[in-house]
């Protein structure tokens, strides 16, 4: 039997008198593409934060299955104010970039006649397997293409000077390159032009992980979602198919 990537079991969450989740039980599989809809103030953003582990239910359970990763695009995403646009985007690929840098270091070290060639070759082989699996040999090109597609500001721009929309595009670019197993998107098409939205739709259509997107953009949902989860007065109602 397939393993769920995420589960809520009798989850309840309230902010004062406002009920966000009322005894909700739900689960979905890896690779699911879900659009979350509902009226403003229904608690959709709060549900995403619970799924991301930023918040917790008051009662019941909400858990990501161990071994899976999760990432979220918040409406006001945090960025590293001490880094440039490129520096923030590179955080999304920090682990694989360090492997690529180490591979290049070993390649240079092999020119030393006194090097321990057996040890270096063994390490290089391990790194090559990881880089092959991540399709990381053209990493710089992948970053450049994603930043261009999402209309990110210039790579050397300081994020502390960016507008809210520019910050969201940088955060979205970083998150997509990070490629978590569960991708949570809060209004992902806000501040994107039509070409960027089209690129995002195509990217998510082939995305290997699960995607949950909160959005009012019904055209986006028609192109991305395979299920719709409607949030209404603390309850969550799933429907198979896209928005239309």
What feature does the model see in each segment?
Residues 1-244:
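ABC ATP-binding cassette signature C-motif
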């Amino acid at each position: 039997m397939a393993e769920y990537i995420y589960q809520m079991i009798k989850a309840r969450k309230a902010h004062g008198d406002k009920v966000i989740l009322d005894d909700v039980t739900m689960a979905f599989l890896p690779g699911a593409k879900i659009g979350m809809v509902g009226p403003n103030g229904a608690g959709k953003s709060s549900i995403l934060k619970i799924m991301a582990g930023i918040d917790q239910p008051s009662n019941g359970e909400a858990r990501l299955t161990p071994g899976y990763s999760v990432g979220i695009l918040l409406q006001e995403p945090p960025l590293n104010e001490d880094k440039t646009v490129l520096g923030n985007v590179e955080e999304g690929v920090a682990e694989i970039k360090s492997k690529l840098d180490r591979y290049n270091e070993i390649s240079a070290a092999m020119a030393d006649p006194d090097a321990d060639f057996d040890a270096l070759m063994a390490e290089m082989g391990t790194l090559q397997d990881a880089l092959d699996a991540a399709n990381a040999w053209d990493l710089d090109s992948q970053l450049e293409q994603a930043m261009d597609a999402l209309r990110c500001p210039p790579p050397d721009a300081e994020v502390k000077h960016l507008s809210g929309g520019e910050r969201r595009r940088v955060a979205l670019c970083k998150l997509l390159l990070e490629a978590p197993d569960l991708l949570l998107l809060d209004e992902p098409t806000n501040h994107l032009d039509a070409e960027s939205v089209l690129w995002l739709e195509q990217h998510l259509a082939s995305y290997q992980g699960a995607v949950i997107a909160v959005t009012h953009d019904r055209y986006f949902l028609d192109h991305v979602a395979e299920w719709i989860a409607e949030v209404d007065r603390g309850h969550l109602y799933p429907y198979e198919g896209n928005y239309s």
